[in-house]
Amino acid sequence: MAEITASMVKELRELTGLGMMECKKALVEADGDMKAAEDLLRIRSGAKASKAAGRIAAEGVISGFVTADGKQGALVEVNCETDFVAKNEDFINFAGNLARLMADKNISDTALLEDMSIAEGETVESVRKALVMKLGENISIRRGISYQTKDHLAMYLHGSRIGVMIDYAGGDEALGKDLAMHIAASKPVCVSSDQVPADALERERQIFTAQAAESGKPANIIEKMVEGRIAKYLAEVTLLGQPFVKDPDQTIEKLLKTKSAKVSGFTLYIVGEGIEKKSDDFAAEVMAQVTQSK
């Protein structure tokens, strides 16, 4: 029997939004397997798929850059330990210079940046180390992506915590900005349903089938229920299937058709996405719940 720790229960609660005891019971039944425990809870509760990748647990900034002609651009995430440092001007400028460098050199592998010149006589790594010494926190270049296109790039930064880069053809600059803002707000996983990973789709199908089976309805009805839920799931996670945030009566797919436009791809970065850091207050949270139950 695997040991079920408080941090495991906390993580499952964040994934599902369900109660502490429900999560602990599911983890025990799943012998500590987080994914299996989540599936158990979803089958029982009818909950939607978690957005595990959206758990925010690190500090830092998203920075981006697009050339004036809209043909080259880059997004980068630089992490630190506290929001205080994330607001530091030198830290913010470092991230901005990285985005420009990545766009200029068309680099998406951040490991290749270390020895590149970012300032007169200084490399990326030397500037990073100097910031660590000055600010007293670990600073890491977590990820980045560069774009070169024959069409158009649009970028949207929501403060410094969310960044979107989109590659599109047709329409105008206003459309590009609207699409980028929509992605930041609605957080699609991919452009179209054929890009949804097969294993993710199969997992949803199995869970929907198990949920529908509990209704006790005939097999043919269950099959229709499952297909309906799959269609809804695909509409939720794909850009083309989502209702446009500025006009929910039309989908992004319909919007693009009216503008004779097409989206080739996009990148969405959220600061700390998928990173977990040690939490010191979970014990206090548990004690508070115990006290309330007395």
UniProtKB/Swiss-Prot annotation:
The organism sits in which domain of life?
Answer: Bacteria
- Residue runs in coiled coils: none
Subcellular localization(s) per the UniProt record = Cytoplasm
This protein's UniProt keywords: Cytoplasm, Elongation factor, Protein biosynthesis
* GO CC field: cytoplasm
Q: Tell me which positions the record assigns to the signal sequence.
A: none
Q: Which SUPFAM superfamilies match?
A: Elongation factor Ts (EF-Ts), dimerisation domain, UBA-like
Output the Gene3D superfamilies linked to this UniProt entry: 1.10.286.20, DNA helicase RuvA subunit, C-terminal domain, Elongation factor Ts, dimerisation domain
Matches recorded under InterPro entries: EF-Ts_dimer_sf (IPR036402), Transl_elong_EFTs/EF1B (IPR001816), Transl_elong_EFTs/EF1B_dimer (IPR014039), Transl_elong_Ts_CS (IPR018101), UBA-like_sf (IPR009060)
Q: Which family does it belong to?
A: Belongs to the EF-Ts family.
The task this protein performs is described as:
Associates with the EF-Tu.GDP complex and induces the exchange of GDP to GTP. It remains bound to the aminoacyl-tRNA.EF-Tu.GTP complex up to the GTP hydrolysis stage on the ribosome.
What HAMAP family is this protein classified in?
EF_Ts
Q: What is this protein called?
A: Elongation factor Ts
Q: Which gene encodes it?
A: tsf
